[in-house]
């Protein structure tokens, strides 16, 4: 696929602070230099509603991975870390899954994780993590705000606003999901 027809998209940020965990994402999907959709929902609740997830990358691939994670959560209820490690093993070793191009941030009341196609399952430092085209901007903004008196949601929203003002593949149509954290 030429660069003109490459799907670009998304910024996802997570913040864990003050007894809350938040994942926020924008709604833009771009094909080359064209915005194809401005209100895509890339942050959602999965499982029994006790896990929140946000994804960046190819949308169909991300949905496949979300479905697989939900199945792992059925196998390992209330064990997000275990379910994520098992998904990462499959993702790395399965011929079909290995070709999927997406990343995910997932969180429950106890843990926040980034899942990558290389089999990495990473926990954030300082309670913040971000992925996607504007991920570095959102991460820098969230880290700068984490020690302020702002709430987790306020930090996530501000980080997304900053990323949207810098990254052309990120818009300000922000979707936020929040859970009480342990």
Curated annotation (Swiss-Prot):
Catalytic activity reported: ATP-dependent cleavage of peptide bonds with broad specificity
Activity regulation, free text: Allosterically activated by HslU binding.
Enzyme Commission number, as recorded: 3.4.25.2
Gene3D superfamilies, A to Z: Glutamine Phosphoribosylpyrophosphate, subunit 1, domain 1 (3.60.20.10)
PANTHER family: ATP-DEPENDENT PROTEASE SUBUNIT HSLV, METALLOPROTEASE TLDD
Subunit structure: A double ring-shaped homohexamer of HslV is capped on each side by a ring-shaped HslU homohexamer. The assembly of the HslU/HslV complex is dependent on binding of ATP.
Function: Protease subunit of a proteasome-like degradation complex believed to be a general protein degrading machinery.
Name of this chain's protein: ATP-dependent protease subunit HslV
